[in-house]
Amino acid sequence: MNKNVLYRSIPKVDILLADEGIKVLIEAYSRESVMEAIHSEMEKLRAYIGTCDDEEKAKHQIALLNENIAKAVAAMHTPNMKKVINGTGTILHTNLGRAPISYEHMMKAAEIVSGYSNLEYNLEAGRRGERYSHFEKLLCKLTGAEAAMAVNNNASSVLLILSSLAKGGEVIVSRGELIEIGGKFRIPDVMEQSGASLVEVGTTNKTHYEDYEEAITEETKALLKVHTSNYRIVGFTESVGIDELVPIAKEHEIPVVEDLGSGVLIDLEKYGLTHEPTVQESIAHGADVVCFSGDKLLGGPQAGIIIGKKKYIDMMKKNQLTRALRIDKFTAAALEMVLMEYLSEETAVQNIPVLRMIATPLEEIEKEARSFVRILRHTGMDAKIQMVSCESQIGGGSLPLERMESRAAIQPNGMSVAEMEEKMRHLEIPIIPRTINDSICLDVRTIERKDYKMIAAELAELLGKKEER
């Protein structure tokens, strides 16, 4: 095998540019994109020939050069971020975007932000306004807080709160609440960035009322309570609640801040889950400032929502960090749309996808699974399809011990689970499954009914028909 001959047989750039198919690509995209693809694919081809020991395979790859250039150009102009089907049963899947936002809410928000809007314009007064005004009254009405604002995520909330209330001073927090929120971002590190000094009290499993009292000095600027929404310590434990911290803080004239993490506005116990502290409860117990995520149990866009006493919220609004951390117009619009649903709990559970998934009873899940299985079987795909029991979970650092009984459609077939899972990730609309006992499963709790037929069609194309095998 003479590799020099193979290298010389690769078409030169000017010959490729004269090709009719390449000319069509230039017209459809741009000369710059096509040239980039040509150079990239030629480099890959040379590298392949350099390691290939099969002359016929090398010639075949040379013959595919134009086709590969076309694919490369198309890939350059195809958005990398795309819709995926979440078949994992994890409702708040961090890697899949956490809370899905309803199509209706997004369309309403898109209508507002696709043109000009009154984002920071007071239509009544005819002058500059606040971007928080669109949802501040709603948040106060729903939670009982005096004032509210939002920044780009909940870590930003903690950063802004501590920078505004405790910069240069000390903040007391229980050792059992020094959480890591994912991606190695930790509460102590966020506190350090705020300019506040951390004072740890208690132990990992036990912190007492007296621990806070004894740690307060003239340098103490706030007491911080962090709800461990992404893990639980069980067994020989004790912690100090907000209602116990408030009297201590009042005595020393310092604020109590609670980071609720996932943040929930309705009691989830009525839907079969254990009690998760609500935002309203925190305010009712006397917390001066409360922060929580917008894209977790609230079911909205990514945001760090801050509510509490007006004097403290006003301090944060004036902090120079606020401009760096502020939310954009799309987030502001989407957040208002989602919060409006909470004016009626029944409406919220129906129209906010996260709440609907959580609240759907097992009987309804079974009905959906049977319907999904029928659609899958109707395609005649080469697979054994059946309904199996499984457990869904909340995910996203929320209610870590909770599992909800669910149902999944399962497709064992001729290819291995690893091979099928890999192929599903590369479909036009990727499908992200879970595996149970070495089988591919699709949990219907996190799959929308409108996607059943599309999923069935994609899998049928992937697996082929039974008679074709």
Regions found by a protein language model. Give the residues of each.
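Long amphipathic alpha-helical segments
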Residues: 1-73
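Short Gly/Ser/Thr- and Asp/Glu-enriched loop/turn motifs at secondary-structure junctions
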Residues: 10-11, 85-89, 298-301, 404, ...
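Glycine-rich phosphate-binding segment of PLP-dependent enzymes
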Residues: 43, 47, 87-88, 98-124
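Long amphipathic N-terminal alpha/beta scaffold segment
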Residues: 51-101, 107-108
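A short linear hydrophobic-aromatic micro-motif
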Residues: 80-81, 148, 429-434
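Conserved PLP-enzyme active-site core in the AAT-like
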Residues: 126-342, 458
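Structural motif of enzymes handling amino- and sulfur-group chemistry
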Residues: 311, 319-320, 327-378, 388-391, ...
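Conserved C-terminal alpha-helix-loop-beta "cap" of PLP-dependent enzymes
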Residues: 362, 366-450, 454-455
